[in-house]
């Protein structure tokens, strides 16, 4: 399923309720097409690993985050230098980063989804449909943008309290040198996992399985899932649909570099 997201301008609590319109992102997309929810019979098939589809997307994502942090630093330092009370513009930063991440997500999910279809033996021109993912990607990237910016704001507030304005550039130096790479790797791992699972669901509804592959320094809950296999349209034992799934909030998804493999059974 395409799970509800904790965050984003269109979302309110509880996590699976949207403001008006559809009840949740699960109301649209390939998960609502009458899939056979019985576990597919085991059969030999081609496995596709999401990590194999990432290409240079982590580098592109890191570049986008670095640019965001630099743009943010210029604006924040200018406002602090002018002794302005409103030195932090959360709506602006959330909007700008969400737009950057959505453009990135749309491009990488389309490329990886098409490639996953091809590797699974299907024709992406017939069996892959990016528009079916776009509403969900918009919700995901809004949530991710807010999480990133809230972390930056908290770090700036802590530095201002301890060292004053002079310490603020260190927040952005660390963001560019450390957070950008880690955040980019986690974001692309999540998008790759989503694209791979979604490709299997679109191309062969009710016929795919997915397997959790633990990454580096995993959470204990994620380590416990290493090798866990489930039908592609159901959740893993933790309630996550794939690595990086933000449905359960940043505590279960932020920084996650686990991946997934999918297989079509016949």
Model feature map: region roles:
Residues 2-26, 252, 260:
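Charged substrate- and nucleic-acid-binding regions of tRNA-handling and nucleotidyl-transfer enzymes
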Residues 217-266:
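Short Cys/His-based metal-binding microdomains
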Residues 20-208, 232-235, 263-266:
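N-terminal leader/targeting and assembly helices and adjacent pre-domain segments
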Residues 1, 214, 262:
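Pocket-edge structural micro-motifs
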Residues 1, 184, 222:
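A residue-level signal for conserved active-site and pocket-lining positions in enzyme catalytic cores
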Residues 209-215:
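Short amphipathic
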């Amino acid at each position: 399923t395409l799970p509800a997201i904790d965050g984003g301008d269109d979302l309110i609590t509880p996590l699976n309720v949207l403001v008006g319109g559809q009840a949740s992102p699960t109301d649209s997309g390939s998960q609502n097409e009458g899939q056979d929810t019985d576990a597919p019979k085991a059969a030999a098939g081609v496995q596709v690993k999401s990590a194999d589809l990432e290409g240079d997307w982590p580098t592109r994502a890191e570049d986008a985050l670095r640019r965001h942090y630099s743009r943010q630093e210029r604006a924040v330092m200018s406002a602090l230098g002018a002794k302005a009370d409103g030195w932090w513009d959360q709506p602006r930063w959330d909007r700008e980063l969400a737009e950057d991440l959505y453009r990135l997500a749309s491009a990488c999910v389309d490329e990886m989804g098409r490639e996953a279809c091809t590797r699974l033996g299907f024709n992406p021109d017939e069996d892959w449909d990016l528009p079916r993912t776009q509403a969900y990607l918009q919700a995901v990237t809004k949530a991710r943008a807010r999480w990133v910016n809230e972390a930056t704001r908290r770090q700036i507030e802590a530095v201002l309290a301890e060292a004053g304005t002079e310490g603020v550039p260190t927040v952005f130096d660390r963001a560019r040198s450390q957070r950008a790479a880690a955040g980019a790797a986690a974001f692309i791992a999540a998008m790759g996992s989503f694209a791979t699972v979604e490709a299997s669901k679109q191309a062969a509804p009710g016929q795919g399985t997915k397997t959790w592959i633990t990454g580096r320094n995993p959470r204990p809950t994620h380590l416990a899932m290493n090798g866990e296999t489930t039908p592609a349209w159901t959740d893993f034992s933790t309630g996550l649909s794939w690595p990086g799934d933000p449905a359960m909030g940043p505590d279960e998804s932020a920084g996650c570099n686990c991946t997934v493999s999918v297989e079509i059974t016949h």
